C-alpha cells in the first residue's frame, strides 16, 4: 500500500494541442516520453469517474506516484529542476503562480518579479519539470502567452585537463570539499572514452565561487600524477528549445534576409565565388585549429615524458636521501651505543671503586673498634695471642706451662746440671752466679724446669732460693704463721730472669702474697 504523501492528483488532458506538446516533449527525453505515455494510457484505461456535485466543472484526474518520475540515484529539488517563467501578468500573486504548477508536485522555491514580468520555480525532479515545461509553455494566462524555459545554472563549473582515470564519482568526491554537489559528469565521446573535460553543478553559488577561486590560485590535483585541473565558469547553452520562429524579432534586417528561400549557389556566380571564399576561410581555421591541437598534444606528450623522467629522478633522490638519513641514524645509534657502553664501564668502575673503598672502610673501622675495645678493657690477649704464647713457652708437661716439681710431683731422676729456676725456661737465660751445685734433677722431656728438691728440707728450714727475703707476710698468707720454723737467710744475689737483674721474676712487688707453689703469674 503506497503512502499518501507520494501520491498526487494529476489532470488528464483531452486537448489535442496538449497531446502534441507532450509528444514533442517525449521525443526529446525518454523519461518525459515514459511519463507522457503513462499519462495517456492511464487516461485511456481509467474509467470515467462521476463528476463532483460541488464542482461539476472540475476536470477528471487520476492518482500517480511522484517517485516514479525520479531516476535511480537522482537528487530532488536541484538546480536542474528550476524553471524560468516569462511574460507573466503584472497582477499575478504567489498563490496563483503556485496553483499553476500544483499538479506537478510540491515546489520548493518560488520567486516572482512583477515589475519585469518573470519568475522562477523549482520542482521535485527533472522529469516533472520537463513535463510542466512541455504543458505550460505557450499557455495563455490573462491574455498573455507564458514563456517557460529551464533556468540557467549559475553554480555550474567546467573542469578541464582531467586524467583518463577520473570518473564521475571521483570528480564529485573531489569537489565536495567546497560544498554540496548536485551533479558531476565526465564527458565522454561516442565510444565511451574520456575527453578530459567535465562539469560540476553545485547546489548554490558560494561553493562554486569558492571552488573557482581556490583552483585558480592553487594547483588542484585529483590523482597521483601532478596534473592540475583547469576550472572555468560553465557556458550556458540552450540546446533543447533553441530559437523558435515565434520568438524572432521581425526587424528590417529580418525581412531583407528572408526575401530568398534556402538554395545552392550556382558555379560561376557572385554567390558561389564568395561562398567558396567563406569555405576556404573555414578550412584554414580548421587546419590552424588542428595544427594548434597537434602542437598542444605534442607539448603535452613531451611534458608527460619530462615529468616521468623527473619523477624517477625525484624518487631516486628521495631514496638516496632516505638511505643517507638511515646511515646517519645508524651512525648516531652506534655512537649512542658506544657512549652507553662507556657509561656502563664508568659506572662499573665507580661501583668497584666504591665497593673497594667500603671494604677498606669496614676493615679500618673493624681495626679501630678492636683497638678501642682493647684500650677500654685493658690488656686482654685474645685466643690467638694465648695460643702464640703457649707455643712460645713450649709444652712443659701435662701440668701446664709451669710444671714445678715438688714433693707431690717429683721430677724424673737424672743428673742434668743444676736445678733450673721455677717456671723459667733455660733458653736465652743468663747463668746465676754462686757456688756450684751438685747434681740435681734432670730436665723434663718438655724442656720445662722441674725442681727436684723439696721446698722444705728435713730440718724444717725453708729455702729462699726462689723468693728473696721481703717484708713480713700479710695476714691471710699461708706462710704467715710459721713462727720459729723459718730462719732468716740472706737473699741470693743475682737471682732473676736475666743475669744481673733484679731478684725474683721482676714483675710487681716481691713482697706480695704467694698462695701456692704452682700458681701462675698474672699478666
Swiss-Prot record:
Membrane-spanning intervals of the chain: none
PTM sites of type Omega-N-methylarginine: 507
Single biological process term from Gene Ontology: membraneless organelle assembly
Region Sufficient for perinucleolar caps localization and interaction with NONO: start-end pairs: 230-357
Record domain RRM: where: 81-153, 155-236
Renumbered residue ranges of the record's region Sufficient for paraspeckles localization: 124-357
Keywords, in A-Z order: Acetylation, Activator, Biological rhythms, Coiled coil, Cytoplasm, Immunity, Innate immunity, Methylation, Nucleus, Phosphoprotein, Repeat, Repressor, RNA-binding, Transcription, Transcription regulation
Phosphoserine modifications at: 409, 473, 477, 509
Expression sites (tissue/organ): Isoform 1 is strongly expressed in testis (leptoten spermatocytes, round spematids and Sertoli cells) and moderately in cerebrum, cerebellum, lung, spleen and ovary (at protein level). Isoform 2 is strongly expressed in kidney and moderately in salivary gland (at protein level).
Pfam families: NOPS (PF08075), RRM_1 (PF00076)
Coiled coil: 282-376
GO cellular component assignments: cytoplasm; fibrillar center; nuclear matrix; nuclear speck; nucleoplasm; paraspeckles
Effect of residue 197 to A: Abolishes RNA-binding activity but not AR-mediated transcription coactivation
Family classification: Belongs to the PSPC family.
Protein name according to UniProt: Paraspeckle component 1
Lineage: Eukaryota, Metazoa, Chordata, Craniata, Vertebrata
Amino acid at each position: 500500500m503506497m503512502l499518501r504523501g507520494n501520491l498526487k492528483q494529476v489532470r488528464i488532458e483531452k486537448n489535442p494541442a496538449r497531446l502534441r506538446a507532450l509528444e514533442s516533449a517525449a521525443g526529446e527525453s525518454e523519461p518525459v516520453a515514459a511519463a507522457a505515455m503513462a499519462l495517456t494510457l492511464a487516461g485511456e484505461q481509467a474509467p470515467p469517474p462521476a463528476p463532483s456535485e460541488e464542482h461539476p466543472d472540475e476536470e477528471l484526474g487520476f492518482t500517480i506516484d511522484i517517485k516514479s518520475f525520479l531516476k535511480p540515484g537522482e537528487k530532488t529539488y536541484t538546480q536542474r529542476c528550476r524553471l524560468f517563467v516569462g511574460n507573466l501578468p503584472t497582477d499575478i500573486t504567489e498563490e496563483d503562480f503556485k496553483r499553476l504548477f500544483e499538479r506537478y508536485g510540491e515546489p520548493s522555491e518560488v520567486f516572482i518579479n512583477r515589475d519585469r514580468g518573470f519568475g522562477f520555480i523549482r520542482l521535485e525532479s527533472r522529469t516533472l519539470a520537463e513535463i510542466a515545461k512541455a504543458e505550460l509553455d505557450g499557455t495563455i494566462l490573462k491574455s498573455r502567452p507564458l514563456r517557460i524555459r529551464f533556468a540557467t545554472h549559475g553554480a555550474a563549473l567546467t573542469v578541464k585537463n582531467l586524467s583518463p582515470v577520473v570518473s564521475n564519482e571521483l570528480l564529485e568526491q573531489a569537489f565536495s570539499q567546497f560544498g554540496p554537489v548536485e551533479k558531476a559528469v565526465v564527458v565522454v565521446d561516442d565510444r565511451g572514452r574520456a575527453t578530459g573535460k567535465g562539469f560540476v553543478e553545485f547546489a548554490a553559488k558560494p561553493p562554486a565561487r569558492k571552488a573557482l577561486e581556490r583552483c585558480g590560485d592553487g594547483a588542484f590535483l585529483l590523482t597521483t600524477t601532478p596534473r592540475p585541473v583547469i576550472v572555468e565558469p560553465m557556458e550556458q547553452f540552450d540546446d533543447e528549445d533553441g530559437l523558435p520562429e515565434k520568438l524572432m524579432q521581425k526587424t528590417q534586417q529580418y525581412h531583407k534576409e528572408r526575401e530568398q528561400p534556402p538554395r545552392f549557389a550556382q558555379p560561376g556566380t557572385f554567390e558561389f565565388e564568395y561562398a567558396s571564399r567563406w569555405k576556404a576561410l573555414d578550412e584554414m581555421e580548421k587546419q590552424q585549429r588542428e595544427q594548434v591541437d597537434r602542437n598542444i598534444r605534442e607539448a603535452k606528450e613531451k611534458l608527460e615524458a619530462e615529468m616521468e623522467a623527473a619523477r624517477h629522478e625525484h624518487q631516486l633522490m628521495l631514496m638516496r636521501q632516505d638511505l643517507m638519513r638511515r646511515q646517519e641514524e645508524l651512525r648516531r645509534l652506534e655512537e649512542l651505543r658506544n657512549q652507553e657502553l662507556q657509561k656502563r664501564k664508568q659506572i662499573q668502575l665507580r661501583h668497584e671503586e666504591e665497593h673497594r673503598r667500603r671494604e677498606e672502610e669496614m676493615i679500618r673501622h673493624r681495626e679501630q673498634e678492636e683497638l678501642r675495645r682493647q684500650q677500654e678493657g685493658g690488656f686482654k690477649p685474645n685466643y690467638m695471642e694465648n695460643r702464640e704464647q703457649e707455643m712460645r713457652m713450649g709444652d712443659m708437661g701435662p701440668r701446664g706451662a709451669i710444671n714445678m716439681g715438688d714433693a707431690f710431683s717429683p721430677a724424673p731422676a737424672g743428673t742434668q746440671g743444676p736445678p733450673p729456676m721455677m717456671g723459667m725456661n733455660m733458653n736465652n737465660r743468663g747463668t746465676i752466679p754462686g757456688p756450684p751445685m751438685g747434681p740435681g734433677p734432670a730436665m723434663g722431656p718438655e724442656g720445662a724446669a722441674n725442681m727436684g728438691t723439696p721446698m722444705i728440707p728435713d730440718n724444717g728450714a725453708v729455702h729462699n732460693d726462689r723468693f728473696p727475703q721481703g717484708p713480713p707476710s700479710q695476714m691471710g698468707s699461708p706462710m704467715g704463721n710459721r713462727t720459729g720454723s723459718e730462719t732468716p737467710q740472706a737473699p741470693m744475689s743475682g737471682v732473676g730472669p736475666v743475669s744481673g737483674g733484679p731478684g725474683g721474676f721482676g714483675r710487681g712487688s716481691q713482697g706480695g702474697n704467694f698462695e701456692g707453689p704452682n700458681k701462675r703469674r698474672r699478666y
